[in-house]
Amino acid sequence: FWPTCAVSLTATLLSVGLMALIGWYRGHLRVHWHMLPLLALYPVWGVVQQFLIQALVAANLMRDGRGTRSLWPALLASACLFALAHVPNLELMAATFLLGATFTPIYLRWRNLWPLGICHGWAGLFFYFWVQGSDPVRVLLKSFR
């Protein structure tokens, strides 16, 4: 558990730092109370996505027909699937491709989805608010009006 936490949190903090710079440049760098519930809720969806891609796809692609292990097909397939799940948003597709390419080797080494899912959720939260200038809570509340 702890090695996965350390590596995934380091990668996430670096990406959130980059997102903060992008948000500052675009004028989207802000902290809003809507972020608080999403810090708890979005990681749940992150764990589900990590399970679907890492546990079901990447882990199975690590074995070819001869029983040998190959990281590159698993890494590329996982990264591409993460990106395709976010069509048509090109920025989000690029970010999720990089996240998938980063998190796949971490999962395959330590086989722990929890830290990856939590970090996935947190990275997604800051991506929406800071990179895209979007508030998912506000969008959701508007849909109920």
Which residues make up each language-model segment?
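Membrane-helix interface linkers and caps
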Residues: F1-A6
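Small-residue-rich segments of transmembrane alpha-helices in multi-pass membrane proteins
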Residues: V7-L14, G67-L75, L108, A123-V131
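Hydrophobic residues within alpha-helical transmembrane segments
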Residues: T10, V44, A77-L81, A94, ...
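Function-critical hydrophobic alpha-helical transmembrane segments in multi-pass membrane proteins
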Residues: S15-A20, W24-L84
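Active-site His/Glu-centered metal-binding helix of metallohydrolases
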Residues: F51-L52, L56, P88, W122, ...
